[in-house]
Amino acid sequence: MSSARAVAVRSRLPEALAWLAFVALLVVPALAWPRGWMLGYLAQTAAMIVLALSYNLLLGTTGLLSFGHAAFAGLGAFVAAHSFNRYGLPLPLVPLAGGAAGAAFGALFGFVATRRAGTAFAMITLGIGELVAAAAWSVPEWFGGAGGVSIDRAAGPALAGWEFGKPMHAYALIAAWCVVAAVAMRVLVRTRLARLANAVRDNPARVAALGTDPCRVRFAMAIAAAFFAGVAGALTLIDVEVATAESVGMLRSGAVLFATVIGGTTAFFGPVVGAVLLTFFSVFVASVSRAWLLYLGLLFVAVVLAAPGGASGRWRAWRDARRHGGARFDARRALPGAGAALAGGVAIVFAAELAYALQFAQNDARRAVIGPWRFDAGAPLGWGIAALAAALGVGLAHAARRWGRGAPRTNGPAFADAIDTCGAACGSAELKARDAGDVDGSTNAASAANETNAVSIASTTSTTSMTSMTSTTSTTSARHAARVSDNAPSPVFEVAAEPVGGGVHAASAPPALRMADVSKSFGATPVLVGIDLTIRPGERHALIGPNGAGKSTLFNLIAGALAPTRGRIALNGIELGRRRPHAVARLGLARSFQQTSVFARMSVYDNLRCAALHAPRARRRWRRGPAAAAAIDRAADAALASIGLAAHRDALAGSLSYAQQRALDVGLALASGASVFLFDEPTAGMSREQARRTIELIRRATAGKTVLMIEHDMDAVFGFADRVSVLVRGELVATGSPAAIRANAAVRAAYLGEAF
């Protein structure tokens, strides 16, 4: 117990030190230099910290890029100012009023914006930001016109002898609210809502398939971010005692974006680092150089190119690599690299200051002040220094690159396969491309398009060979393709049915899945025609057919990702109608995807915890605190052990091999606690042994539950399924037991091949 406690203490020590440094940043300079300029600088920093942390609730936690975040801070400041002036609200409560106003406007605008993600969300917020900025000048009665709305913080009532007219007292209030807001946001990012927001950031289609509407998660996080933005706006109001139209403008929205990206979105304190740097540039660098915005822009570009994770992300990558023995100091590479950065910085500063001196020269005074030196912008000396520094930087950078070629990389640990070693052919198919903005209608658009093309080609060709199995499936399935005449009508084979598991109870219960006359067309091209299929509770049913037959489209119809053109689908006796994917999942349906669909930037364990959150029992008692959390953790642990990834518990899902991600994809479906499972080619890209283990895992984990599986590996199909259905060119041509399907000569001729 003592060793476990020591490990827990050590794991919490870095965050405790970060909080200590954060508080010291706000307190120590104010006590050491209690002057007006220092207190004003610290107040600006504190307000920007809160604003940047609130912005990271959108960008880092939920994956939403906003160009109008400052609008909520500015609107919160205006509401807070009017509350203080008109209603005598005590100054310590002014940030609360600003937060409430920010949340209200966040709900109003977020209701529209969060229906989309990605580029669409960014463009909507850009329009909202411009709308609010225009309104600030068009409604002077509320926004105060050019002068804004001012307050006199000394006019409010004193609190325990504190008169907030004094700069130190006002700053103490701002710093206290900054710490309180930061703690509140830290608590928020540890909640289940934030965990779901991380999942929505990585894979909204998968979240919908688990049973949560991604739009609702985005909406909730947008309101939370707007609340804290309103608090930040009120803190700025307390500092400068005026709310102006500039506070809702695009410049401030861009500033908070810069701060968050420079500091890093992957660590909680990353935006704090960015806010400190941004305020330093806007105050100290701006006081000595007119080119400070240029320097800030160059820093932003450098961070995006060289350290996409920001300063904190770079630090964490180095720390993790060092922890796993991958980070070693290589003087031959590090020293020239540092020298190149220094020389490049000198070249940029000289060139920028000389250019600004030429551009803004007054009375023929073209002097550029660089540190203690003055240079004539028209003389060659300064430009020569800039050119020399640039040449030196290029040379050192080339040397660092050349000498570092043989140095070991610091990409962190290499992870072994969970099931078995995956072939090189598997690795190229790891990642999926999906529009995060429309998870309901385009979940598998590429798959549906492929099937549409396959059907249209088949309908216009006199004779063609049935497409062989996908290149990523096992070598066994490649033998099962056969030629079919497209001029002949699709054969309907009568195959004797055999009773399946479920017993008397299954016979009396409604079908687990019932499809009646289900058809789907894309434009004028039919993909599915008149599908009639009933799957009993507890049945293991396999759906086979050539590529382009419409199998994945049928899965998307069942899961709610697509709406049928005609027909009805019922799950456990409930008509699905036009329910969206999250609503269908809540009725007890879980699915895996044709391509791996996991939450790449979350750990394997957090992936499974996110799925376990959606189990029916967890949904019923998610508010019950520690007991419910412990139950979710136990479910995630059980799923982790069952899929063989216990050794990679804390690894990011995106770092796993293809076979491991396939196993995790299956594990997400299993951990959801559903009663009906759809598995879309769960063994695709696996070796025969990997496929055997995966099928055995599914058989064991879904005992007594209903399974509908698409699979091209006929050995897996005939060894797993109670019944098999054959889909050819969008029509269901046969349904029966594996033995009957295997024995039917017409089915073998159409699809399986004579080898079976």
Model-derived segments and spans:
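Conserved ABC transporter NBD signature motif
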Residues: 567-575, 586-587
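Catalytic Walker B motif of ABC-type/P-loop ATPase nucleotide-binding domains
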Residues: 677-681
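The feature captures the beta-strand-to-loop junction immediately N-terminal to the Walker
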Residues: 544-546
